[in-house]
Amino acid sequence: MTTSATVIIMVLCVGSLVIFSEGSIGFELVTPLPGKPDECPVEDGRTLAIGQTEQVPGQCEERTCIKMDDQLYFELAGCGISEAGPGCEMFESKAETYPECCTPEIKCN
């Protein structure tokens, strides 16, 4: 499969996921460390193996190390956009892990 065909399929799949789940999915190209061609490096010097998932520190999202067309990527899964209705306020969730942190607290007058 060509790279452009892979990207089109990914966009279609991601679009379907966003429409039905109200979440978000993104991809970040990763440059592997020398001698570790099948591992995604993270900020603190550790690496994630292909298929390994972890919570992104300080954010309400998780990342998974994936490989497509001989390139490494982080697949980032997050909450998407939430809105409170008229007369309501939205507050960040107190949960610390994804996806539980995606559910905001809503208070209405």
Swiss-Prot record:
Leader peptide range in chain numbering: 1-23
Record flagged with keyword Signal: yes
Keywords carried by this UniProt record: Disulfide bond, Secreted, Signal, Toxin
InterPro entries linked to this entry: SVWC_dom, Vago-like
Superkingdom as given in the UniProt entry: Eukaryota
Compartment(s) where it occurs, according to its Swiss-Prot or TrEMBL record: Secreted
PTM annotation, UniProt: Contains 4 disulfide bonds.
MF terms (GO), sorted A to Z: toxin activity
GO cellular component: extracellular region
Disulfide bonds: none
Coiled coil spans: none
Tissue: Expressed by the venom gland.
Record family assignment: Belongs to the scoloptoxin-16 family.
Name of the protein described by the UniProt record: U-scoloptoxin(16)-Ssd1a
Organism this protein belongs to: Scolopendra dehaani
